[in-house]
């Protein structure tokens, strides 16, 4: 509409008036009946920049009689075309992706379905029994025919029904440099309008981007109203959580006039949350958002993918990257129509385990020998009742026939099974031919038997269109499960690997905590019965061929989120983890302290030769393995091998269970630094103690771990058991000079500070490490926590005369940042990194008032005050 025609329409009252929103009924926007406007001029409530007037209220006009449902579909959504999709009717409501409309096409508010009385004067266009009791008020079409509709209350207080405006709530971006940015415009009451930028943030922007299928990450921007021309403002103070599927589902206020902050409208910039290395993907030409031709956005333009070697494993990755769960299937030969523009990729060979197509082996960008007749496509069929699959075979083309119903896969009994039934199943799965296979070829299912006495004519397009018994009614056992082998007609189909697997928090990509992606969420595996055979299957699925070792008891740290799987039982020969799961997903009796892990391509500890000893003995404070940060109190798991000088002083087993007594710091191959108070209880007899180096998980023997006897204990001569001053000691390990502990990437010495060095001025980036109190229990894995050094006056004020010049003060003073080093961490190191240099042990954990107590920082022995004494004893 040109500006002149817009102004003329404005003068003639041809534009609708924005009246208000109803916060209870999903903030649906209402306006007056466009067929029966009241006499006189009819202006919108607020147009910028020339007009500001509050909304007018008036009684709703008489309501019309409703015609028969038309055959035409509702108007197409503009942003869907922009995103490369052609909208199709949603089986229950408006076009797929817009099922949240709750206003009729003449502006009446929809009633909640549960609020509609059972007896009506006029019958709606279709049975609505399935919707009774629903608490929402979204427009629906129960029989899938005709336009969506809803009930509303008319001016006389009676309940009537009306068709809905399916474009209501559509959004688009205007005025940006590309389709991923611009001013937000919302379609309501037949007119595109904008949103006031008050309280507009990234959560609101992300909902817009998700609704437009332009990625899940949005950045909030603002645009001056002065550049937008004459346009209504609909909303202000939009308050989205960020996970809504449509802007209509967010809390917001109807625009009541006034002034927007700096007279700015809401705008967004959209991006895909996977980061710049993950290409932007969309599906085009399909009948829904769950299927279509694969198109990638690269170098400023959209292009397609060639179908050479394209299979279901590639489709799984595409569906995962798009956030679409369900069954992934690859389609070939431009099944969803030929695309335009360049062919971006060829020879894509995913394993099915990647999170993005960028991680798959493939050709270079733009290199191919294809035309658009070979454009690749995918379908990501949602797991709704009636979805079918073939399971337990060598690929997606063969196996037990399983049907999804009420959240669970079940089988089909073979009573009365015919070739026509097989034909319908294979055709629905995208294959040309098929035959019934012997049930002995595939492992028996342990789930329910959902269907029996199925009879197809061969003309059905969907398996559930065939006649059958009611769900769950049968007289069969699993020995009668239907098994099928379908023939792809020359197209190779590799095995679909089921849910993806990843390894987390290891020191390299070949080890870590095992996590699986199920139901749209990463979760862990419980270690009940976890063995090297299970680890072998995980490593094989990830593409590793060497020996595999299982790790238990959260060896790589505790995961977050759900525990998906328990009691895995692999023989070691399975193709993927999915073949080993015998228990229902999500059923377990575990905690994250039992998370399972693996090490792939495990060849044990490599022997340390003389060259290794020579190269490492001359350095200190070197961290060969460091990447991330999980907890002492307020801390986090360290990376295995990330603090190679961390050792533990342990009681020998005849004094108990060989338990950890104190932390300590390796200064050289034969000398260890710790706290003097560690020897108060059991004395300073060397027979009572051992030192463990290279340890990470206290209960799991590890390849770099070594327990060494104690040859000598040297406690500072000024230390008194009834005092905390001079709390420092040295321990000489058993062995020839400089040959006590063997250095490796996991065993290295720390550096000493300079004499009288003041770390508050020379060092930053400080950490405490140990196996101590985590706030819940003592940790099995080595913990780390960043900790700030504090001016000594904080501890002098708190501890008075107990704090001396031979001590350091460190910790967080705020209760919500509880970082402290306690109990099992006594004697352990406080390490700081010299800028651009190495790691130095500035403190030895000594004492404090409680653990992580507000206003009670930890006290550490100041190592720089004892450097001459340390060097005189150790000859370093």
From Swiss-Prot:
Query: Which residue stretches belong to region Disordered?
Result: 29-89
Record's function text = Plays a role in neuronal plasticity and the proteolytic action may subserve structural reorganizations associated with learning and memory operations.
Disulfide bridges in this chain: 94-166, 110-150, 139-164, 196-260, 209-270, 240-250, 306-370, 319-380, 350-360, 413-476, 426-486, 456-466, 526-590, 539-600, 570-580, 620-751, 662-678, 766-832, 795-809, 822-851
Compositional bias segments (type: Low complexity): 43-54
Keyword annotations for this protein, in alphabetical order, are: Disulfide bond, Glycoprotein, Hydrolase, Kringle, Protease, Repeat, Secreted, Serine protease, Signal
**Domain Kringle per the UniProt entry, residue ranges:** 94-166
- Name the enzyme group at the top EC level: hydrolase
**Family annotation (Pfam families):** Kringle (PF00051), SRCR (PF00530), Trypsin (PF00089)
Where does the SRCR domain start and stop, copy by copy? 171-272, 281-382, 388-488, 501-602
Task: Write down the InterPro entries for this protein, in alphabetical order.
Answer: Kringle, Kringle-like, Kringle_CS, Kringle_sf, Peptidase_S1_PA, Peptidase_S1_PA_chymotrypsin, Peptidase_S1A, SRCR
Spell out the CDD domains in the cross-references.
Answer: Tryp_SPc
Q: Where is the active site?
A: 677 (charge relay system), 727 (charge relay system), 826 (charge relay system)
* Protein name listed in UniProt: Neurotrypsin
Just give the chief location class: secreted
Q: Where is this region: Zymogen activation region?
A: 620-631
Q: What is its EC number?
A: 3.4.21.-
Q: Which GO terms describe its cellular component?
A: axon; dendrite; plasma membrane; synaptic cleft; terminal bouton
| Annotated GO MF terms | serine-type endopeptidase activity
Q: Name where it's found.
A: Secreted
Report the glycosylation sites.
26, 684
The organism's superkingdom is given as: Eukaryota
Give me the stretches of Pro residues compositional bias. Answer: 57-72
The region annotated as signal peptide is 1-20
Instruction: Site Reactive bond homolog: give positions.
Output: 631-632
GO BP terms, alphabetized = exocytosis; proteolysis
**Which family does the record assign?**
Belongs to the peptidase S1 family.
